[in-house]
Amino acid sequence: GTGIASNIRRMLIEEGASEEEAQSKLFAFDVPGLLVDDTPGLTEPQKLYVQKRSNFATWKLESPGTITLMDVVRNARPSVLIGVTATNGLFNAEVLGQMAKNDERPIIFALSNPTSKTECTPEEVAVATKGRGLVATGSPFTPFMYEGKEFVTSQCNNMFIFPGVGLGALVSKASKITTKMFLQASKALSEFVTDEQRAKNMLLPDLTNIRKVSACVAKAVAIEARESGLGRILSDEELDRVIAKAQW
């Protein structure tokens, strides 16, 4: 979870946010609740994402002393939830319904595997958000119908990123793989989702396009390697050719 938070924080800063602004937008949880400055037993990675308890003095809490997920969803009004908790049902109807009040198209990542441990199911998101929630899961789910519309669930899997990152590093002869390469890979992936796929509430491309996705990701990584002085100086056109030649 802290690894995900680290990359989101880096992306926010890349997009122009200050370190303080980026930090303020991230609310990290563990078993005791929201990670705050007086949470006992914090690990070193967790300490990077604690909030000051004093920041929430005016919040209405479900239980004094503990800041729950529902407390944050109701008071901070986030638009994105990311679950890697292996806690089935954590994103319940109340939480999902509040997310739909926070944003017209709330984004829900229920990434825990297997399905018996997922934070919520895609159908639960559809019902609680009246079809407006965008969801991706760690486990595969079959398409379903809600209110006469087909919903296709994106499986958030490293197969969309890792092969392309490896290919991009290989063709560019990158001396190392950096966090920024992964950020550029993520941007390339996000731009690959079509309007038709978004209409089905998909957050990621269809798996049938995985070869093209990997080539697109590879090019983004190779360009970053070139721009950062870590890889070969090849034009965009040359990169297209060497990437196509390297795939099989």
List each model region and its residues:
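Glycine-rich phosphate/diphosphate-binding loop of Rossmann-like nucleotide-binding domains
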Residues: G1-V80, R232
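Generic beta-strand/beta-sheet core signal
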Residues: G3, F29, G83-T85, N102, ...
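Long hydrophobic segments that form regular secondary structure
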Residues: P64-G131, K173
